[in-house]
């Protein structure tokens, strides 16, 4: 544990308060085990290239993890990968690719995006397909306890069997709509799917009730408990997951007799024109497209600058304002380095700690950082090098918690997007190979579809005598 962590307090003495969706209020964070924190973050369904809406949750809860770790907590942080899903199967089939190859390709894309933005790698990153045994065991427990039933190869959760169903989202049982469509095997259309019976051409696994594949809600429960146990501290994800996904996770865990998550944290969406950023709405901004406008550290600063529970309305003006703010911090630190000497990481301020302990109030924490920058610049201009160095050291400590310390070697080159673009090149080359195969078999529609998808992601393909070449599409700044 560092001296600066000891100065603020560690373990249960930290004073951290978090908004718990289940309670509908801010609560003191009291971990299940003193000095330890167990966190599960719902990760990506790897069906396509990540956009900034996808990675916001990664950035938001990376700050929580960094704050806990810096204050002496031993943090187990699990982020799953959903690598089997209707959308993955459909998109892979449309592209003429094996489903597992499609999922693995975009899993790498998400890993590259998280890494480009400085999100710490999780303690473990389980794939759904690697935990089928645990899912089957969970479903068997639910059937044995009378909370689930098999019908025609499918297995459903009996919503009416659980009196507290709807406690997270506040949905009354009469208002529940699972969004699964009508299924003939359901006893009640409010029931949700735990296991889907095998269909021709789809992957399947053997179970006591026949071959099939897992339902989305079952995947996360099994992986949570496999890595964190039947009860753990924090379950996190986007606010769009509150219902039905997280509600249905709770139903399964409680139906099986497990305590499950003690705190539920949800981040707000990234919006454009007031609408949630979504591929179905066509208003997404892929990570490669944004990284052609700003550096990775600047994008991280932007995504983390709003309170994690608030909506983050994307606009070019807001993005450039974040760039200007980050550059101001960076320039001050470089001024101190050039005039005074290298800047060590010092201690954060009490106001910064109070802000993060108040439900991760990053906007207030950033205000403290910019106040320190202003004071440091004044000190530097007046020749007070000691004060300037003190402020710079404090700023480094605070920016390090936010994951974007400009003097960290990850960002210091001022060209931190290069690694991300190398990762993008791997993905684009795979797409171009798929396009070439489609052209060879004269499937012009498939070839054009691949080219169009790349263009939507901000990548332009030009056919040359030496083969297809790609470049990032120039955007107006």
UniProtKB/Swiss-Prot annotation:
It comes from the Bacteria. Its EC number is 6.1.1.16. Keywords: Aminoacyl-tRNA synthetase, ATP-binding, Cytoplasm, Ligase, Metal-binding, Nucleotide-binding, Protein biosynthesis, Zinc. CDD domains: CysRS_core (cd00672). One of its GO terms (biological process) is cysteinyl-tRNA aminoacylation. A motif ('HIGH' region) lies at residues 44-54. Its main location: cytoplasm. A motif ('KMSKS' region) lies at residues 276-280. Zn(2+) binds at residues 42, 220, 245, 249. Its cofactor is Zn(2+). It is an enzyme of class 6 (ligase). It is found in: Cytoplasm. InterPro entries: Cys-tRNA-ligase, Cys-tRNA-synt_Ia_DALR, Cys-tRNA/MSH_ligase, CysS_C, Rossmann-like_a/b/a_fold, tRNA-synt_1_cat_dom, tRNAsynth_Ia_anticodon-bd. One of its GO terms (molecular function) is ATP binding. One of its GO terms (cellular component) is cytosol. Binds 1 zinc ion per subunit. Belongs to the class-I aminoacyl-tRNA synthetase family. Monomer. This is Cysteine--tRNA ligase.
